[in-house]
Amino acid sequence: MGKIVRVTGPLVVADEMRGSRMYEVVRVGELGLIGEIIRLEGDKAVIQVYEETAGIKPGEPVMGTGASLSVELGPGLLTSIYDGIQRPLEILRSQSGDFIGRGLTAPALSRDKKWHFTPKVKVGDKVVGGDIIGVVPETSIIEHKIMIPPEIEGEIIEIVGEGDYTIEEVIAKVKAPNGEIKEVRMYQRWPVRMKRPYKQKLPPEVPLVTGQRTIDTFFPQAKGGTAAIPGPFGSGKTVTQHQLAKWSDAEVVVYIGCGERGNEMTDVLEEFPKLKDPRTGKPLMERTVLIANTSNMPVAAREASIYTGITIAEYFRDMGYNVALMADSTSRWAEALREISGRLEEMPGEEGYPAYLASKVAEFYERAGRVRTLGSDDRIGSVSVIGAVSPPGGDLSDPVVQNTLRVVKVFWALDADLARRRHFPAINWLTSYSLYVDSIKDWWQNNVDPEWKAMRDEAMALLQKESELEEIVRIVGPDALPEREKAILLVARMLREDYLQQDAFHEVDTYCLPKKQVTMMRVILNFYRHTMRAIDAGIPVEEIAKLPVREEIGRMKYNPNIEEIAVLMEKTKEQFEELFKKYGE
């Protein structure tokens, strides 16, 4: 027990704290606000408080809890809405109304709800950390696997039968090799700043299919990969994040609203329960954990929210699921680091951010990955991290953007000019990149189409060529170009408008199957080849642009039938043959 000697915003300095540990959770002041020790000097402790500190004064007590900041992991996580330190917001609302009272806490997982547990092991079985001892149908989509905590191994000496139990009840007892008996419950606690262990990290060879053509075709994200979406205000970061949360083929989605506006979290809360998961037809909320830490909540909790989210994601990864984690936005988290660092009177780095910003950012993204999990069976799980970055004024030389780009492998650059032209998703195809293209091309070629990589490269080359020609067009106008180059501009425009542009609010176009993506690209590139043949035969581009099939190609993205789209190849051929006849005469 100690007492407060100084309060500066979210930072509190307390005296007489000998015996405390770094990152220990403490209760500050008469109200018992939740805080965490972030620095120890002699018997003084510097505490970062996760709630509003107004009204706290020197002399008030500080109580240590002896535990580090931990999350509860067990049945009941899915469909929940937490704040940055895993307090369940719906329960806090029933206790204190729409605004959270200070010093309030509630258990993250319900202690009264009974879950139907089915055991998967029997007495006498040998188990190690990570082994699945039973399953609970948590939602109609996700089966929650109850695992032995990583630090326990030995022989099962007691296991309950199939039935309904609360998470507090002991469901198994394990006799360790030293004779000690360990009790296993349905939930475990885990410190958020510590990675959950695994056997082996695997290369990212499987794409995270998102149904967004720009992303899947040109700048793919791998399962277990890391991606950043930087962009100025209004360029569509949050809508892109929502699209990925809705349609990516991960089994579990963890969405962290970190320092963003409250209405953006409200959007998620209103939309997700109504939206259906394309694979199961059930509401999307049933596979989602939401962490709402909006901009009007205390700054310090932003830092915790990122770690809380990734720890929950790692827990589902350990069950063998593919998890997608959206962090919106990591800039707000970095700003929280900057504020705390400033109040600690540390030496500032670039733009006032702390000098350790790079290592903090790397530490967070490093927890992504595709892994072989702990346990005697061979499970593979992954955590894919997609972080939005909102630099002031859309400036990509911002330290947060630069430090993020050092560690992530996919960069989706959102462009305000494209957004103003109503081109969504506003991902700039000239500045974005993905370093996973070569590692996942085998998956595309074996499962979707053997020509995927060649077609992607050809389409990309056309778009690059268009940007070179744009310079000339600005100076001399399009009419001065030779016919071949006019044809390149025509086809590149088709690629942009009929392929890259995608309507997030159209029931068909919001999600595009990999097979449909490849078919659409083949139709456009087939049109390009016929166009080049026609130009060589002396047919002017104006005539080609008038072909009726062009309009049908423009509408193909709204057609759910892949066979009907493939028919356009034949139609293109027929209409070009008619052109050849007309000009041949």
Swiss-Prot record:
Looking at the UniProt record for this protein, which Gene Ontology cellular component terms does it annotate, in alphabetical order? Answer: plasma membrane; proton-transporting two-sector ATPase complex, catalytic domain
Q: Where in the cell is it found?
A: Cell membrane
Query: How does the record say this protein sits in the membrane?
Result: Peripheral membrane protein
Q: Which keywords describe this protein according to UniProt?
A: ATP synthesis, ATP-binding, Cell membrane, Hydrogen ion transport, Ion transport, Membrane, Nucleotide-binding, Translocase, Transport
Q: Which reaction does it catalyse?
A: ATP + H2O + 4 H(+)(in) = ADP + phosphate + 5 H(+)(out)
- One Pfam assignment: ATP-synt_ab_Xtn
Q: CDD domains recorded for this chain?
A: ATP-synt_V_A-type_alpha_C, ATP-synt_V_A-type_alpha_N, V_A-ATPase_A
Molecular functions per Gene Ontology: ATP binding; ATP hydrolysis activity; proton-transporting ATP synthase activity, rotational mechanism; proton-transporting ATPase activity, rotational mechanism
Chain sites annotated for binding ATP: 231-238
Q: Which GO terms describe its biological process?
A: proton motive force-driven plasma membrane ATP synthesis
The annotated subunit structure for this chain is:
Has multiple subunits with at least A(3), B(3), C, D, E, F, H, I and proteolipid K(x).
* Function statement: Component of the A-type ATP synthase that produces ATP from ADP in the presence of a proton gradient across the membrane. The A chain is the catalytic subunit.
The protein in question is named: A-type ATP synthase subunit A
Q: Which organism is it from?
A: Thermococcus sibiricus (strain DSM 12597 / MM 739)
